[in-house]
Amino acid sequence: MIRFNRAIRPFSVMSFDLDDTLYNNHPIIKAAVSAQQNYLNALPRYQEQGPQYWQKCRQLAALQQPELKDNVTQWRKHTLHLALSKLGFTEQEVALHASNAYNAFADARSNIVVSDDVLALLDNLAQHFTLIAITNGNDCNLCILGRFPSCAIAYRCACFDLFHINHTCF
């Protein structure tokens, strides 16, 4: 049994993680990876590297900069630059194709389907609470959930502490 020695004040904020909380994330990630891969496979020299090339570059990126493992967005972007650079693309081509490949991933990543029941529940909760979405990859402005959260908090590192957030977003 939990015992409180002080009165608990009413809640004014409700936070939640998007992935697998409000919708099934597995098909979303699969589609996002596929969208990125489709873009990359259309580039000369990329498809010739085989299906393991992305994984090898991803592992190399993590070895070069281990802190990237704590920020999946930056890890993906760095891996894209590394993979394209290794294939001999110019700096300008690397920048262009890395950006386009990432955008293909991000657009598909934000193409989520939330059931009408969940949307109705969120509408109801938004009448009473400030809703906050915690995410490490979604762009709330690109998906249907952008109409709900007052502030989207992106996970940036393993030491991230929610108590150090700038409270002006509330």
Residue ranges and their predicted role:
Residues M1, V114-V118, I165:
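Amphipathic coiled-coil/heptad-repeat helices and related helical stalk/stem segments
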Residues I2-K56:
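Active-site neighborhood of HAD-like aspartate-dependent phosphohydrolases
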Residues N25, I29, V72, R76, ...:
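Hydrophobic (often cysteine-bearing) scaffold residues that line and stabilize catalytic clefts
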Residues I29-Q37, W54-R58, R76, L80, ...:
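Hydrophobic alpha-helical core bundles mediating ligand binding, dimerization, or RNAP-core interactions
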Residues Q59-Y102:
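A metal-dependent, Asp-based hydrolase signature
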Residues L96-N111, V118-F160:
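Substrate-recognition element of Asp-dependent hydrolases with the DxDx(T/V) motif
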Residues A152, D161-F170:
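Conserved Lys-Pro-Asp/Glu-containing loop-to-beta segment of HAD-superfamily phosphomonoesterases
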